[in-house]
Amino acid sequence: MKKINYILAVILTISSFGTFAQSQKINTEKSTINWLGKKIGGQHEGLINIKSGELEEKGGKIVSGSFVIDMTSITNTDLTDASYNQKLVGHLKSDDFFGIEKFPTANLNITKATKFSNGKASVTGDVTIKGKTETITFDIVKKGNSYSAKIEIDRSKHNVRFGSTSFFDSLGDKAIDDLFILDIKLVVS
């Protein structure tokens, strides 16, 4: 009888490990954020670094997550002319766009998620850019110790006004799409 009780205690102890949340730090060296912004007649793209972050999983779903994005690290990868590249990056860092002197970071905080099914889940979270917060929902894919997501963000919700038809009329071919895309690859350790 003691042996059966001991075996049951061991089984219960082992099975209870699966119910605890597992916190995982984001490996900022291996994780990437590619951005894409479109305008009439073209587009630009580049990279932004993740400063810090973590994900917490429990029972096959993300229960929380927070990420700090280093807006001072924004780069452009499609312009090969150094002068034009510098000009664009400087403009993106200026108050016309992300105002990095006042807002050096952006944040994403996951508030809820569905359970992973075939490696995919739906995530809802709050994204804060330039001090303005918007709730967004997006799909995330998990493969091993990495996660990927493509997130569309409406810059007009974050007071990023330059070239936006949401704020200015008669921009014609100078208009820049309000939506920009973040293609995120997270590696946890």
Task: For the regions a language model picked out, list residue spans one by one.
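Low-complexity, acidic/polar, glycine-enriched regions of mature
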Residues: A21-S189
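Bacterial Sec-dependent N-terminal signal peptides
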Residues: M1-Q24
